[in-house]
Amino acid sequence: VFSHTFVSCGDNDDEPKITYNNITMDCKTTHTIKGDDSWTSSNKYIASVSGNTLTAERVGKAIISSKNNSFTVTVTPTVSVFKEPCLEWGASKSRVKSFMSGYTLDKEMTNQLNYKGTGSLILATYNFQNDGLSGAAIGLNGDYVNSEALSEQMTQYYIPIEVDESNYSFYFITPDEKTLVLLKLASSGSTIIYAIVYVPRSNSSSRATSEDLETIISTIGISASGNPSEKFNEMKSHLF
């Protein structure tokens, strides 16, 4: 939804001023900003500006501003394969339970919550340290997932960082650079399993370490011995 309101000011003004209203854009679309201002974005990974062309890069909100004006752009996804888990690092178990109120709690331990999935979702799991959320993951059943749509959603939500071909893994970071994301593939027979794992970014690290992910991945049960290389290579061509 785009909206620019033209307002005529006092008689001493040479020309009418432009009032810039907040807008909503689909991811990967562009919009031309009216006027001659020089614009910048509060987060170029969500919405970038080149001249007067505004590009919706990834899902989220960014403030587009010039010397005299500003407005907020909200970027929305065009695909929806999975729902993100709770990523409020440090949150309590009660907060995560509230976030997951529409799902069935399968198992609760001192430092972990596991939820049953439905449809393509195998399960969702949360890890806690010092009573605060420290990791989250979802497992997806590839029999119910379009891999091209999954790749597209990953690029609409996250910034690709690295590929690990030996481990059938893709690494990402969120546009606010606060969360590291791993997409790992495995196969069990003809079924591809996708694990999407989230951990808070620590220090200056740009990717999650194997130590960060080991416990969460094992919870999903992605130790299947099959070879997902064909599907992995298909996704790699889309993601990188």
Spans of model-derived segments:
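Sec-dependent N-terminal signal peptides
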Residues: 1-3, 64
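C-terminal motif of bacterial Sec signal peptides marking the signal peptidase cleavage site
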Residues: 4-8
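Short helix/turn-capping signatures at newly exposed starts of structured segments
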Residues: 10-29, 44-45, 57-61, 67-159, ...
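Short strand-edge motifs at loop-to-beta-strand transitions and within beta-strands
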Residues: 52-54
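Short, exposed beta-strand-loop hairpins at the edges of beta-sheets
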Residues: 65, 181-190
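Short Gly/Thr-rich strand-loop-strand
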Residues: 156-177
